[in-house]
């Protein structure tokens, strides 16, 4: 059986940790002037992928 391929886009966006998959939060690319400093600061923090999405991410990262 051939090797499974890693989805490179997913590999760049998610990192496997002991607690699940770490990801960056959205809404911090543009139109930042109307967002408060507190909101932007909190959006810089990494968060975990939700439980429902973990199987899909794991399938695309077979060697993670």
Swiss-Prot record:
Q: Alphabetically, which GO biological process terms does the record hold?
A: translation
Keywords assigned: Ribonucleoprotein, Ribosomal protein
Q: Has the keyword Ribonucleoprotein been applied to this entry?
A: yes
Give the InterPro entries listed for this entry: Ribosomal_bL35, Ribosomal_bL35-like, Ribosomal_bL35_CS, Ribosomal_bL35_sf
PROSITE patterns attached to this UniProt entry? RIBOSOMAL_L35
Could you tell me which SUPFAM superfamilies the record lists for this protein? L35p-like
What transmembrane ranges does the database entry give?
Answer: none
Pfam families cross-referenced by the UniProt entry: Ribosomal_L35p
Q: Can you quote a single GO CC term?
A: cytosolic large ribosomal subunit
GO molecular function terms noted in the UniProt entry: structural constituent of ribosome
The text of the family note is: Belongs to the bacterial ribosomal protein bL35 family.
In Swiss-Prot or TrEMBL terms, this protein is called Large ribosomal subunit protein bL35
């Amino acid at each position: 059986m051939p090797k499974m391929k890693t989805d490179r886009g997913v590999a760049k966006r998610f990192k496997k940790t002991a607690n699940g998959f770490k990801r960056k939060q959205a809404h911090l690319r543009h139109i930042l002037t109307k967002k408060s400093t507190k909101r932007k600061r909190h959006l810089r923090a990494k968060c975990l992928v939700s439980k429902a999405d973990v199987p899909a991410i794991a399938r695309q990262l077979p060697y993670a």
